[in-house]
């Protein structure tokens, strides 16, 4: 009888510890989305906009922000068509450079001809990244 009580007690303690561990892990689900390197914030949209799709899939970016101004936007690994993605990188990503976060959120950037879906996806990634920055800086 005592053995059963001890076993139940051990099981309850183990279950409680597991629940606590899961709770703590889920509390920091946004870890890695925004980091700070010296005085520059870096927002990575890989998790933040994982549902945003270009022509072939997700189009995550890293947004570098210093003094509330966008320094640069870096394209991260994706499955977009290389020819079209090269156009997006060359013609679209630098459009936000030098803008304040608020101005960038209000600016309507044109899509790149021939890479419309990829362009729209990048624009949405940038929007979500900047909104996240504003809420969490």
Task: Give, region by region, the residue ranges found by the protein language model.
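Flexible, solvent-exposed loop/hinge segments and secondary-structure transition points
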Residues: 8-14, 23-137
